[in-house]
């Protein structure tokens, strides 16, 4: 994605140096070893391998990733590698290109994936994409990502569909190539609840929101097609936005071909959404500052996002409802029984950490993780196959839409000096990793 130009035009903040993992990864891997972290996620920047998206390979980029993966494997910090984590090359947005809305990008992605599978055989855990629904939402619903369009549900669904076709083709290529390891996809999945479960209109609002965020990509992954009511809802919302969907027979064939080969599903989960039915025009405001109460979410054809009384929220208005993760995992198991296993690939709390004399007391983050892990254990007891948990995140970092004040890390970063400091949550997490017990 053309993030550099997009962020420069906004003028809010710069993505440099962020956490500088490119240069600091030996330090971060050492922290992993010291604090009981045996696996972390990392992505390959497509344009570091193919600067123009296709064609000539950059040998320096290839060498860097070999070194990174070797260092991590030697340290016992296993790499779980994503091929495209919000950074589709800018080349696909030039000369009239619209990223994955342009179908030739699908084929380019598959060729890039094939190269990586063959080149980086030391990697045994692959994900194709990170958070396709978030990509669509930021690009075409909220409009705070490049493309920067708002309320275009037609383009949002089309983008997700095209990316899912790319995922499916890459998954088939991985298995046809006989590569060792596993492959899946990471999605940001978010439970949707009616504000009043006894109100049919609220239930319908929650169902429509669920199609946007969850069912569209889950159907594509585990059904190999879109269920009739899923397609009906998506088509309705596309028409409200003034567009049509282009779902071709050969696309469905590609999704179907991948069905046996989706080895795992990565679930990124932070919050849920309560919805009520409402009539009116679109009105969404993203809270990217931490000014609590400033977010709005009203989507025509869906409804309005609300806060249920007694349910806490973060300063960024994200609803804290750990039980929702349990509901989500059981739902995946019940609705898509052909799934094989899940990883919780992101879970954590954005917080305004206070740095005082080298110590960061982030008790709310500890409480957040403890509650979510407890519900994960309950889901496992209920028959869900959860094979791993990745806290988001290892260290504080730059956020595309929030800048630097929304910190997620177990390790605090002084962005001026790049020094790392363990937070209270890092010590708590170390204890959990070493004992297997959810300590208070």
Which stretches of residues belong to each language-model region?
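Active-site region of glycoside hydrolase catalytic domains
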Residues: 1-9, 52-54, 62-440
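N-terminal structural segment of carbohydrate-active enzymes
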Residues: 1-58, 62, 68, 74
